Design a protein with these regions (language model features):
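Ferredoxin-type iron-sulfur electron-transfer modules and their immediate structural context
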Residues: 1-50, 112-144, 154-157
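Flanking helices and flexible, charged tails adjoining ferredoxin-like Fe-S electron-transfer domains
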Residues: 54-157
C-alpha cells in the first residue's frame, strides 16, 4: 500500500515545526525567546531585529526574528515551544520531518520553517481547546498587539 496510501498519524503526533503567519500574511514571531527558554534540548536559537518602515506587511509587530533556527538533531519534539509561544507563531504539525545526510541540513532556518502564503498549514486539529482559548484571550497582555492598544486614561484628582 505504501507509498500510495499513508498511515494515519495519531492526533497527538508532533512532527515538522512551522512558523505561522497571521491572516494578512505577516510573520507572527516577535523573537521574544520564550520558545527557546522553554526548550529542554536547547534546540532553538534566534536573533531579533527592528522592523523598518515599509515592512509592516511582512512582520506583525515592531520586533521580529531576523534569524530563527531549530537544530532538528537536538529537538525531542516535546511541544513545549508551541505551548510557550504567546503569539501563536510556532506549531508542530502532523508532517514527517525530512531527513538528510549532513548535519548542516538538519538545522532548519526560516526558509524551511515559515509557512508559505499560498499554502497555509492547518494546525488547529492538534491543539487542545483550552490552549486555543487561552491564547486568543485578549485580557492576557502577551496576546495583545498594537492594534488592540487603548489610550491610557489620565486621572484628574
Amino acid at each position: 500500500k505504501y507509498p500510495d496510501v499513508q498511515r494515519e498519524s495519531a492526533p497527538v503526533y508532533r512532527g515538522q515545526h512551522v512558523l505561522k503567519r497571521d491572516e494578512a500574511g505577516a510573520e507572527r514571531c516577535t523573537a521574544c525567546g520564550l520558545c527557546a527558554v522553554a526548550c529542554p534540548a536547547e534546540a532553538i536559537t534566534m536573533e531579533s531585529a527592528e522592523r523598518k518602515k515599509g515592512e509592516e506587511n511582512l512582520f506583525r509587530e515592531e520586533k521580529y526574528a531576523s534569524i530563527y533556527e531549530i537544530n532538528m538533531l537536538r529537538c525531542i519534539f516535546c511541544g513545549l515551544c508551541e505551548e510557550a509561544c504567546p503569539k501563536e507563531a510556532i506549531f508542530l504539525t502532523d508532517r514527517i520531518v525530512p531527513s538528510s545526510f549532513t548535519r548542516g541540513e538538519e538545522v532548519f532556518g526560516k526558509d524551511k520553517l515559515v509557512e508559505s502564503t499560498e499554502n497555509p498549514i492547518d494546525v488547529t486539529k492538534r491543539q487542545r481547546q483550552e490552549v486555543i482559548d487561552f491564547k486568543k484571550d485578549k485580557r492576557h497582555y502577551h496576546n495583545r498587539t498594537f492594534l488592540d492598544a487603548k489610550p491610557i486614561a489620565k486621572n484628574h484628582h
